[in-house]
């Protein structure tokens, strides 16, 4: 550190469970004579700190099995108190339905309420391998959301 005019340390306070991390970093910086900055990142929030609202669009072409709408609603309601990223939720819903139904084609699109002006609308699709639906899935993925909605027209 003697090769530099000034050395400064930065710690990001992002709501970590162990505040001891920040305390130890502060003490080490003080011992070394290093200026220490703590940047509060709590504005990012934790995964489960804020409720998320979404409209989930599910379209599928069945093969031999269909899902009853009441069962599907109960399954989707199980996500009410589930803390996870939007993308993970949509991917899990899609994979669960593929495993359950073995459909020819399936797509799941989550339209989540924007936070801070940023909209995250994850999309999952599946086409049964070796069928024309495999090509349909690829085509739909490439054409998906070419003209996304604006935040003010939801």
Swiss-Prot record:
Xref: InterPro entries: GTP-CH-I_C/QueF, NADPH_dep_7-cyano-7-deazaG_red, QueC, QueF, QueF_type1
Pathway: tRNA modification; tRNA-queuosine biosynthesis
One example of a Gene Ontology biological process annotation: queuosine biosynthetic process
CC per GO annotation: cytoplasm
Designated name of the protein: Putative NADPH-dependent 7-cyano-7-deazaguanine reductase
Main function: Catalyzes the NADPH-dependent reduction of 7-cyano-7-deazaguanine (preQ0) to 7-aminomethyl-7-deazaguanine (preQ1).
Residues annotated to bind substrate: 67-69, 86-87
Leading EC class: oxidoreductase
Annotated organism of origin: Streptococcus pneumoniae serotype 4 (strain ATCC BAA-334 / TIGR4)
Encoding gene per record: queF
Subcellular location: Cytoplasm
